[in-house]
Amino acid sequence: MEESINPIISIGPVIFNLTMLAMTLLIVGVIFVFIYWASRNMTLKPKGKQNVLEYVYDFVIGFTEPNIGSRYMKDYSLFFLCLFLFMVIANNLGLMTKIQTIDGTNWWSSPTANLQYDLTLSFLVILLTHIESVRRRGFKKSIKSFMSPVFVIPMNILEEFTNFLSLALRIFGNIFAGEVMTSLLLLLSHQAIYWYPVAFGANLAWTAFSVFISCIQAYVFTLLTSVYLGNKINIEEE
């Protein structure tokens, strides 16, 4: 399997991955269009497209509210809805098609199949939990809960690091492996004409399985984000 590269552009010391940037903008656009379309002309008794939006919304609230608590859920409900939709689409984009030039430049892939992208998402989640902890409880109380008692400071630092790393590596491993297997099956179909039916059937089954795994990973990522955030903002006052 030939190595693929993503096109990049440099602005001073900052390097932008054009494929990841384009995929991210596409995902944001799809989410915006979906929510705008489904929320137009909403009625008290939901029907049609409104049912779809409310079903997804209720599903996300159902597994995140126990971690956040009803007290804060209304402030974060739209965030978790958009995060879940973002991860579902991001995980499955690379399964739809593959756009790659002869020289190996890749113009279409799942952004979450890129380790740097996943590490960035994970870092933003951990950063958000600390920002919200300070905003909800104040800087002093947040620091105190993190550094008291003193002997648990190394354990707390290790916990934050492992949370950050596991959140990124879990989703990267699953999505990257899915795209690699899809590429291998496509290559198999090009080897000989008699391999085509086998490769087609295997690729169809693998794609269906990968979509399922991708949705599960979106669920897990959103769930863990709610757990980490809930742990930071729901600490009982001393």
Curated annotation (Swiss-Prot):
SUPFAM superfamilies: F1F0 ATP synthase subunit A. GO terms for biological process: proton motive force-driven plasma membrane ATP synthesis. Gene3D superfamilies: ATP synthase, F0 complex, subunit A (1.20.120.220). Keywords: ATP synthesis, Cell membrane, CF(0), Hydrogen ion transport, Ion transport, Membrane, Transmembrane, Transmembrane helix, Transport. It is found in: Cell membrane. GO terms for cellular component: plasma membrane; proton-transporting ATP synthase complex. One of its GO terms (molecular function) is proton-transporting ATP synthase activity, rotational mechanism. It is a multi-pass membrane protein. The keyword Phosphoprotein does not apply. The chain crosses the membrane at residues 15-35, 76-96, 111-131, 167-187, 208-230. Its main location: membrane. Key component of the proton channel; it plays a direct role in the translocation of protons across the membrane. F-type ATPases have 2 components, CF(1) - the catalytic core - and CF(0) - the membrane proton channel. CF(1) has five subunits: alpha(3), beta(3), gamma(1), delta(1), epsilon(1). CF(0) has three main subunits: a(1), b(2) and c(9-12). The alpha and beta chains form an alternating ring which encloses part of the gamma chain. CF(1) is attached to CF(0) by a central stalk formed by the gamma and epsilon chains, while a peripheral stalk is formed by the delta and b chains. Belongs to the ATPase A chain family. This is ATP synthase subunit a.
